[in-house]
Amino acid sequence: MLEAILHSDGGSRGNPGPAGCGFELLDATTGDVLALAGTFLGTASNNVAEYSALVWGMQNALAAGVQHLSARADS
């Protein structure tokens, strides 16, 4: 069973304002990076940026065949 840890974060400069988000997906056993990405979102709120990062990371976990996911975020 593939277990992974998802770290996600997003933010905006202003609320709303220019925003971005990113995530890293790590194999929980080895610490190997399974996926890593970030992007500019355009104008968005800080909440949209945070949740976008989380959802994007979870989609990548599903695509990587992760069966158990531990998500970690600062919000």
Annotated model-derived regions:
Residues S70-S75:
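Short, intrinsically disordered, charge-balanced linker/junction segments flanking boundaries
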Residues M1-V48, S52, W56-L69:
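RNase H-like nuclease fold core
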